[in-house]
């Protein structure tokens, strides 16, 4: 399962709209870097966030998710309370080709500050804005910068195409826009 290089990512982004908007070079001056890299693409977080709070709910239940436990924030940055969690989404809209799976890894700049970015793999033929999960593992408030890099997408090409893609399976997060909360069907 080879890791796909920059020229492949650029070609797919420009010809097949795999990533929109697409930044064809690494932008790093004065910001947490984003854009095309040697073997991946550093995605940006939008300016919309949902931060968890314990004011109205005593537990998180993925099968019965209560939106009242979230506070919405829009702005140039997001402050995540100590030992807490926030959701965001990518600026970029991704369209994953059928023979490819995408693994998302957090950027080391945030990891070195105790901020962990988690995303499950982007399945073959999935498309949408990626919902990002941020964990602040520190005892201090942590800052996430909008419109800057937060994670790197690594594109892995399968030896053959899968029999059933995310689109074929009518996956529940297909075509998501903005921050998408848990769905259990």
From Swiss-Prot:
InterPro entries according to UniProt: dCTP_deaminase, dUTPase-like_sf, dUTPase_trimeric
Any one GO molecular function term: dCTP deaminase activity
Pathway linked to the protein: Pyrimidine metabolism; dUMP biosynthesis; dUMP from dCTP (dUTP route): step 1/2
Keywords annotated in UniProt: Hydrolase, Nucleotide metabolism, Nucleotide-binding
Biological process (GO), any one: dUMP biosynthetic process
Stored Gene3D superfamilies: 2.70.40.10
Database matches in NCBIfam families: dCTP_deam
Entries under HAMAP family matching the protein: dCTP_deaminase (MF_00146)
PANTHER family per UniProt: DCTP DEAMINASE
Protein name from the UniProt record: dCTP deaminase
Protein source organism: Neorickettsia sennetsu (strain ATCC VR-367 / Miyayama)
Organism lineage: Bacteria, Pseudomonadati, Pseudomonadota, Alphaproteobacteria, Rickettsiales
